[in-house]
Amino acid sequence: MKYSYDEIKNLVEKYMQDEDESPVLIAIDGNCAAGKTTLAARLQSDLGGNVFHMDDYYLQSFQRTKERLRETGGNVDYERFKKEVIEPLKKGEAVGVYACIHPDFVLEYRETIEYKKLNIIEGSYSCHPYFDSPYKLQIFVEAGFEVQVERIRKRNGEVMLQRFINEWIPKENEYFRKMKIKENCLQIKM
């Protein structure tokens, strides 16, 4: 079953109305160029809260080993994301965001994000099993291959499109399939 935006928003609102002071963590995973960032921004605009981007958690240079890059779901720094984002949020603490910057893949301080009850984690690999399911809600956003190609071409250009097609899209698809990501998420109509 695919949910509408309003149905997803209503579910998030219900979690936020709980008297419980625990954080509401929402994950938005799915294909690259499917609309994850757009969905996160819309939820934030309508409901408030924070948005954290998995794209800030690329592997650093020293982590880019053959073994790590062969690992299903291994081309994101899931250890650092859990330590720097998920663990502080579960304790109701602010989060210091250090983005991994191209082309040298070194960490650069970006900002400190104050704690809010609603925290939206968006990006491929946001539902990685390493995180031990900290989310109240997991959403999967999907786009067909042709739509992906057109959006990536427009957003990233022809040269990067080839890298997406040959490298990143196959890695994502392997992660979705082997870790049953889509099956463990609500799916949204975009």
What do the PLM-derived regions correspond to, one by one?
Residues 1-25:
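Extreme N-terminal, non-catalytic leader segments
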Residues 31:
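P-loop (Walker A) phosphate-binding loop of NTP-binding proteins
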Residues 35:
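Conserved glycine(s) of the Walker
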Residues 39:
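Hydrophobic positions on the alpha1 helix immediately C-terminal to the Walker A/P-loop
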Residues 49-62:
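Short beta-strand-centered segment that lines the nucleotide-binding/catalytic pocket of NTP-utilizing
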Residues 63-106, 118:
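Conserved nucleotide-sensing/catalytic segment adjacent to the nucleotide-binding pocket
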Residues 106-107, 128, 133, 157-190:
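Small-molecule kinase domains that catalyze NTP-dependent phosphoryl transfer to phosphate-bearing small molecules
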Residues 106-155:
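ATP-dependent NMP and nucleoside kinases share a basic, alpha-helical "lid"
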